[in-house]
Amino acid sequence: MRQVKAALPALRSSQGRIIFTSSGAAVNTYSTWGAYGASKAVLNRLALTLSVEEPDVTTISIRPGAVDTEMQRELREVHHNTMDTRDAEKFAGLKASGGLLKPEQPGHVMARLALDAPKELSGRFLR
C-alpha cells in the first residue's frame, strides 16, 4: 500500500500502470491458506477501487496460474503435511505432470501489461 501511495503522483502524470500479482487462492478456498487468500482478494479489490479513484492510472490484478516457484516447492516439500490431502496431491501432481509454468511465462505477460495494458482492463482480475 505504501509503495502504491508513493508511486501514485508519478503514475498519474505518466498515465502509468500498476500490475498486482494475485492468485487463485483469492477466489478458491484452500485449507490453512486463509491469510494468503484474503491478502490476494484484497489486491483484487484494491485494483478495482483504484480503477475508480485513479482514472489516469491503469490498475490490473492478474492470476498467473501455477508457476514453478519457491512457494510451489515449499507446498510440496515442507507444508504438504499441514495441507488438506487433496490440495497437497494436486500441487504435487502439477509438478510431476509438468503442469507448472516457468516463471518467465507469466513474467512476460505481466511485463507486457505494465508497458501496454489498455485502459479498458483497469480494475480487472485477469486469469
Regions of interest found by a model, annotated:
Residues 28, 49-58:
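Active-site-adjacent segment of SDR/Rossmann-fold oxidoreductases
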Residues 6-15:
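A short helix-coil junction within the Rossmann-fold of NAD(P)-dependent oxidoreductases
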Residues 1, 36:
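Catalytic tyrosine of NAD(P)H-dependent dehydrogenase/reductases that use a Tyr as the general acid/base
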Residues 61-64, 69, 80-127:
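C-terminal helical subdomain
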Residues 19, 59-62, 72:
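Hydrophobic structural elements of the Rossmann-like NAD(P)H-binding subdomain
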Residues 23:
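Residue(s) in the substrate-gating loop at a strand-loop-helix junction
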Residues 4, 39:
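Active-site helix of classical SDR
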